Amino acid sequence: MRNKLKNFIFIFFCFSFLCKSANSNEAFIFNITEIEILENGNQINGYKGGTATSKDGSIITADKFFFNKLTNILEVTGNVKYLDSSNDIIITSDKAIYLKNEEKVYTTGNSKAVNANNTITASSLEYDKINNIFKAKKNAVAEDFEKETTIYADEITYLKNEEKVFTTGNSKAVNENNTITASSLEYDKINNIFKAKKNAVAEDFEKETTTYADEITYLKNE
């Protein structure tokens, strides 16, 4: 009887908390198995899995949640999934920090960003939601399925609105018939132009040619 009463009280508390969040000026609505509220309601911790939904419809799924209402910063760990439905983007990782005031997401561990035609993987990712910019660091890989191109580098920056990719460190671009390697690459996805800088090497497997130069510009459409 005591256990039933305890469960009822816990469920009632969670329901009351969700209703309060939904009807007030909260940054997130939490739907979590266990919730802990500390520091006069300014620190919200969640355990055993759940979701946090922001006003714009973005949903974060994770095992653990730590939200500071004063700073509007949400930290999540374990099986993290961030869904930005407005930009059609899904980000997964081991851990993530969401700076709500700046609309920026930082991930660490097994990080991956996916949309309709592109995938970016790396050890860590930065996502600037307002400017639609991705930065992938350490073992970064960017795949463009539409143009059948894969880019590898130490760091990759993807300007989604401009459809441009910039890389630094051990950079390599690969498609069906060509490979370009250099210290850094620039890829204009709209015009299909590659620029390789410093120790650039371009291989054309179809024509069986290799070009070496300090800088190489490859106009793929031509």
Regions found by a protein language model. Name each.
Residues F8-F17:
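Bacterial N-terminal signal peptides
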Residues S21-E222:
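N-terminal amphipathic/hydrophobic interface segments
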Residues M1-I9:
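Bacterial N-terminal signal peptides that target proteins for export
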